[in-house]
Amino acid sequence: VEVDGRPVREEKKVYILLNKPAGYISTVDDPRGRKTVLDLVADVKERVYPVGRLDYDTSGLLILTNDGDLTYKLTHPSFEVKKTYLVEVEGNPGKELERLEQGVLLSDGMTAPALVSRVKAGKESTSFQLTIHEGRNRQVRRMCEAIGHPVKSLKRIKFAFLELADLPEGKYRYLTEKEIKNLQGLA
């Protein structure tokens, strides 16, 4: 490939798993000057983009890449890529958690059924894992509000088969060749 008679090399594909802290936005730049996830990977030479989004107040697993085809496959609803969150909500929802498993009516329609597991109820809050395959704006927070239990903290702990493991918050690692091939094979 040439541009203005000069050969142009295709940029090397890069695949990064980031443990995003709360307080960063999942965009390339912010007109309001807030910190972005790219600030956390400033030493990466290639121009990468977040695969999907995590809210400003949400922490956890975020993939960054310059592979547009893979980004499409991982974010398009038809591919139903599962994402698991560690959710802490106010109060003790009990039976209301079953509503999450049946789907919840939000302002933009009914959600697909979610999977709720590892529930730990305390006096003032309840923690559980929630797995969804949709990626609507602030979906987990809105689902929990819809059952009357606002989110206190939210962390994505799994994206497809990828997990944070012991990766410290604010740090990243490159995906292995096997992980990349497995992601590409999801769709």
Predicted regions and their residues:
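Basic, flexible Lys/Arg- and Gly-enriched helix-loop patches that mediate nucleic-acid binding at interfaces
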Residues: 1-187
